[in-house]
Amino acid sequence: MNTVREPSKTVLIVEKQANYTQLLVKQVMFAGLRPLVAVTGEGGLRKALEFHPNLVLLELDLTDMNGLEFIALMKEHPRLQKIPIIAMSIFSYLKNGALYGGCEDFLKKPVKMIELMTHIRRYLRQRLKYKSPDREP
């Protein structure tokens, strides 16, 4: 009998750009992880509360709130404060604010997928396979 194993770890992707979200979802799934997607900060907070992901990938430039506000709300909430957050942005000047605000890491976009998987592996403490299903952005 064949059984399909469910992914054991969940990654919440909070990203407003659909094409970048698709790329991140592919990489997360390829690594055997379960992706959750939100396109707004408010949606991301709702999903974080509902599903309690193991990690959050956060675009800092959101449509409904500043990514730094999202970080603060996550870190203030007792159920969410220990969830690691990897912030991403095309603006490298946001790095210090993100790290000071409580992010575990910051990646400058466009992110190389092998670099992203290295960072995800670090925070999930799980050995992940990496073989790009697509070309790097």
Predicted feature locations:
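Two-component/phosphorelay signaling modules centered on CheY-like receiver
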Residues: 18-36
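Alpha4 helix (beta4-alpha4-beta5 surface) of REC/receiver domains from two-component response regulators
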Residues: 69, 90-108, 115-118, 122, ...
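Active-site beta3 strand of CheY-like receiver
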Residues: 51-62
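Acidic catalytic/metal-coordinating carboxylates
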Residues: 40-43, 66-69
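Hydrophobic/aromatic residues positioned on beta-strands within the core alpha/beta folds
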Residues: 86-88
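Non-catalytic signal-transmission and effector/linker regions of two-component phosphorelay proteins
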Residues: 1-16, 114-137
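The feature encodes the CheY-like receiver
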Residues: 63, 81, 109
